[in-house]
C-alpha cells in the first residue's frame, strides 16, 4: 500500500472534501478594503482634506501598485500586493490587526527596512505607511477578518498634493518596472 492510499483510508469519508478551500494564483479577486474612512472613528465623517486626497490618490495611483485577494473567509483574509519603487502609500490605520510577509524586494516601515522573508505585525489602530525600496516590494497581507476599516490620517491638502505629485512623477519609471519575483503575475 502506498503512503497516499494509507492516508486516504485514515481520513475515512472526509477524504473527498476534507473541508479544504484551495486557491489558485489565476483566480484571485481585486483587493479593496470594504470600508475606507478618514481618521476619527467608524461613524465620523472623513476630514475634507482626506476626501480630496483620496480623490487625487485614486486619479493618480494607477500603475504604481496592484493587489489581489487570494483567500477570504470570516476568520482569515489573505491578499497579495505589489508596490513599485517609492510608491507613496498614505499614512493610515486599520481596525483589525495585520501581518505583512515580504516575498521579494524591500520596504521600509518606520525606520526598519524589511526584505525577503521578513515580516511585520501591525496592531489595530496603529498608524503606518510603507515605502518600497528601489526594486519595489511584493508581500502577503494577512488579517483575521475580511471586514476591516481603513482610516486615512493625512489631514492637510499639502500632504495629499505631495502624494499625488509623487504618483504623477513616477508613472514613466513605473511603466518599465517588473515585479521583483512575480509570485502572482498581475498588472497594476
PLM feature segments, named:
Residues 82-85, 93-108, 113:
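Short, conserved beta-strand element in jelly-roll/cupin
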Residues 1-75, 157-188:
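A short, N-terminal "cap"/entry segment at the start of jelly-roll beta-barrel domains
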Residues 78-82, 99, 119-121, 141:
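Conserved hydrophobic/aromatic beta-strand scaffold that supports enzyme active sites
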Residues 74, 108-110, 133:
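Short strand-coil-strand connectors
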Residues 113-116, 124-155:
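Ligand-binding loop in jelly-roll beta-barrel domains
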Amino acid at each position: 500500500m502506498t503512503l497516499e492510499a494509507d492516508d486516504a483510508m485514515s481520513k475515512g469519508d472526509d477524504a473527498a472534501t476534507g473541508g479544504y478551500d484551495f486557491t489558485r494564483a489565476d483566480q484571485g479577486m481585486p483587493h479593496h478594503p470594504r470600508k475606507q474612512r478618514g481618521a476619527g472613528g467608524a461613524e465620523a465623517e472623513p476630514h475634507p482634506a482626506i476626501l480630496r486626497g483620496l480623490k487625487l490618490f485614486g486619479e493618480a495611483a494607477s500603475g504604481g501598485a496592484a493587489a489581489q485577494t487570494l483567500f477570504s473567509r470570516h476568520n482569515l483574509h489573505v491578499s497579495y500586493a505589489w508596490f513599485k519603487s517609492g510608491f507613496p502609500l498614505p499614512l493610515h490605520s486599520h481596525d483589525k490587526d495585520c501581518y505583512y510577509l515580504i516575498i521579494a524586494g524591500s520596504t521600509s516601515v518606520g525606520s526598519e527596512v524589511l526584505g525577503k522573508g521578513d515580516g511585520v505585525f501591525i496592531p489595530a489602530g496603529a498608524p503606518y505607511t510603507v515605502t518600497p525600496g528601489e526594486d519595489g516590494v511584493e508581500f502577503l497581507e494577512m488579517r483575521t477578518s475580511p471586514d476591516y476599516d481603513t482610516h486615512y490620517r493625512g489631514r492637510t491638502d499639502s500632504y495629499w498634493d505631495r502624494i499625488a505629485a509623487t504618483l504623477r512623477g513616477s508613472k514613466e519609471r513605473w511603466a518599465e518596472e517588473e515585479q521583483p519575483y512575480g509570485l502572482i503575475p498581475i498588472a497594476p
